[in-house]
């Protein structure tokens, strides 16, 4: 690790697939509380800009930090080009960027609204901790920010000026004189302390149960943010599933999730203890996303994480019991937060400023001081690869499992690939639990992508498909049939979601071209993401949720590279209507 004079920390991470990865602590959704919620997320969308033909890049905003990364495409750019590109998001010739024109901000706010719509249609993205800390359940920004459009340039400028050296963590895959010079002349020029220190009054958030959609019964227990507690949590994270951490307002919470309600109840009542046995040597081999989160969340970790290995493996037998004592003391005093699974649309007693409703109650749980049972947690095993075909009847369940456990989903033409550390029995236990089954069915919008895909690739009518909705994934398995487009180029339907999808054909269509279209639509504020699957040579199935379906359709139908197409445009309504979808697609069975 290299530390600049202003406090910027630079790590060489040869195992990452990113040429440069930059994180900024104290710069996430929490920063917006008391101001305009969504400012941090808006800034992320404005800053990131790159040539999709030369680079792969992305950015994200979390509760307490923001992160940005960029990597070069081999043969089209170099790692140094990627580093220069990321630096250009923050710095221009005059130094740190300060100018944000209203004309550009407007389209990014529209993009934020599309992201909100996407995340609420497909995922459960509500943040219980930020809500309890006086934020909203969703803090990523909404279309209502347009009401303060003229104020946003100055607000964004002030936010940029709040960036300081000690808040910056940088990972680079390779470090040489050129890269070091680029970093020193840019991030190395940031101030070492803020010009102003805002006065914030922390909101007490302990002793609450919040009822919201969740695949598990989750308890967030506040513990002291000491170095030994942090290292102990990292040990538990390496050994066990469903153990993690959260930070809010500089407070540290150990999160422990339970599949069964009786285990959750016995833990809170004190009648059961958790089996926190460290049965193997700790290695601290984490991915770069986890490491970035860790360095940004815990400023007390001032060295490379591997420098702590000897301390951990020498003292783990005393560190873990100390953390346990802290956990049980907080449980006894009620200093914890519970996320209790609830899927009712009518049950609520509070609402945030965006009128998202939920249930929040006090924890009035009597603690028993004599535990009689021990709860064994799910252990992490060696890495396994799980491949699920689109034809698998449990496809959606596995997707929800991966999302609920924060696992990356890799897609290809025939299915998805998930890398995990679960045993077969543990996966079966989760998938068969009543709470998880309710969770996986609580967001049906994702099914529309496969309903329409099945219509295009199979010989089934839309009526047949709707009658077998529960097994629709099986119906849309990868057929070897030849698809011939008919005369009708558009179907208008009504569903519970607003989206545009369809099949598009053209001799020059490539995945790179579709990726470029996605970014152009994003910059126009028309979509958040675009999913596509190649059905056969030069023919793709496209799907995108959008609150502007007509604008997206007009853009797609004006692309000259699409020589043939059939578009499905869905208007959001309370009642579904697929009656317009008469089979005009010819399937040549083979």
From Swiss-Prot:
It is an enzyme of class 3 (hydrolase). Zn(2+) binds at residues 41, 45. The active site is at 44. Its cofactor is Zn(2+). The keyword Protein biosynthesis does not apply. GO terms for molecular function: metalloendopeptidase activity; zinc ion binding. Pfam families: Peptidase_M44 (PF03410). Binds 1 zinc ion. Disulfide bonds: none annotated. Keywords: Hydrolase, Metal-binding, Metalloprotease, Protease, Zinc. Its EC number is 3.4.24.-. One of its GO terms (biological process) is proteolysis. Seems to be involved in viral proteins maturation by cleavage at Ala-Gly-|-Xaa motifs. Belongs to the peptidase M44 family. This is Probable metalloendopeptidase G1-type. It comes from Rabbit fibroma virus (strain Kasza). The lineage of its organism: Viruses, Varidnaviria, Bamfordvirae, Nucleocytoviricota, Pokkesviricetes.
